[in-house]
Amino acid sequence: MEKLTIRDIDLKGKRVIMRVDFNVPMKDGEITDDTRIVEALPTIKYAIENGAIVILLSHLGRPKGERKPEFSLLPVAKRLSELLGKEVTFIPELYGEIVNEKVKNAKEGDVILLENTRFDKGETKNDPELAKKWAELADIHVNDAFGTAHRAHASNVGIAQYIPSVAGFLMEKEIKFLSKATTNPEKPYVVVLGGAKVSDKIGVITNLLDKADKILIGGAMMFTFLKSLGYNVGSSLVEDDKLDLAKRILEQAKEKGTEIVLPVDTVCAQKIEAGVETKTIDIKDGLPEGWMGLDIGPKTVELFRNSISGAKTIVWNGPMGVFEIEDFSNGTKEVAIAIAEETSKGATTIIGGGDSAAAIAKFGLKDKVSHVSTGGGASLEFLEGKELPGIASIANKKKIEN
């Protein structure tokens, strides 16, 4: 179902309350990475240029319903002012007299940022009273926070009970690309999964078994699969309570004709730290006790590169190893390069949020793939085939069009 977007509505003179994702990393009151603010700019600018009064809502961190100065959005307001080249009015409140007054006196093109939504306990509880207070400030709600789309909160879901909600450009882009991975993906379709735990990716594997041609498994989760097949994995991280499940997934894949590609070698060490002695060991030979696999090995890199080659749709979620440490970063880097190469040949490539997004940025390949998702948990749930509350609450195309 297509969703209404900010393009579909007349904004002139309208008060627009916009849920953005300004949950940026901070250190000592300074923003260390403003990517999320930059990504919200196109929607904010569009609203300003089309004569709207813009009221922005965002959370930052997890203050758990308490006013904590280190979670204030004041530094965000300053950075946003610089990026927009115009003053952003910051109000250190969420509702009440001061907020009502400022909004009432605002002119077309003005931008107001309210304080951290999570300073009120009602935000994460999706409190209808809180949602109503925000809805009363505006004519229309714009949801541009994909990162919280898997949460039903007052600022993204509750508010849509009172005023119409439409998607911002970032939300629209996320839905468009992630839908390509879950609905009629162009074939061959290859899914690359990594990260530590099978349990985090069960939903994705199960949902994509029917759709993908190949699923490549790296990261620490590979050892649960390998152990389920009887291989000796030494002291590698294994979810022993998921061994039967891993075996079942491999059997299901066989039945469905989906190829699951498991690593054939691994880079091992006795400790997870830089500068330690490393060994590359073939999986068939088994890992000695005390040694753990911390990256895919060179033979696996080659195997994965060949599997990725020629794909028309690629989804990648989760690193191949402990990529933050140089000695264990090669697998993740090589997979990132292989995916970038296929993108240049016309493949649609989608990188799940979180660690994979951090990895692709680290290796300077962010602009060499089709789409890097801004939401870790949200992109994972979308790929699991779940309906996300923050998307469900956005009006459908045919609903308010006339």
Curated annotation (Swiss-Prot):
Record-listed ATP binding positions: K201, G293, E324, G353, G354, D355, S356
UniProt: substrate binding residues: D21, F22, N23, R36, H59, L60, G61, R62, R118, R151
GO cellular component: cytosol
SUPFAM superfamilies in UniProt: Phosphoglycerate kinase
GO molecular function list: ADP binding; ATP binding; phosphoglycerate kinase activity
Catalytic activities: (2R)-3-phosphoglycerate + ATP = (2R)-3-phospho-glyceroyl phosphate + ADP
GO biological process: gluconeogenesis; glycolytic process
InterPro entries: Phosphoglycerate_kinase (IPR001576), Phosphoglycerate_kinase_CS (IPR015911), Phosphoglycerate_kinase_N (IPR015824), Phosphoglycerate_kinase_sf (IPR036043)
UniProt-listed Enzyme Commission number(s): 2.7.2.3
Biochemical pathway: Carbohydrate degradation; glycolysis; pyruvate from D-glyceraldehyde 3-phosphate: step 2/5
Entry superkingdom: Bacteria
Pfam families (UniProt xref): PGK (PF00162)
Keywords: ATP-binding, Cytoplasm, Glycolysis, Kinase, Nucleotide-binding, Transferase
Localization of this protein: Cytoplasm
Chief localisation class: cytoplasm
Disulfide bonds: none
Enzyme class, spelled out: transferase
PANTHER family with a match to the protein in the record: PHOSPHOGLYCERATE KINASE, PHOSPHOGLYCERATE KINASE 1, CHLOROPLASTIC-RELATED
Family indicated by similarity: Belongs to the phosphoglycerate kinase family.
Subunit record text: Monomer.
Protein name, as recorded: Phosphoglycerate kinase
Source organism phylogeny: Bacteria, Thermotogati, Thermotogota, Thermotogae, Thermotogales
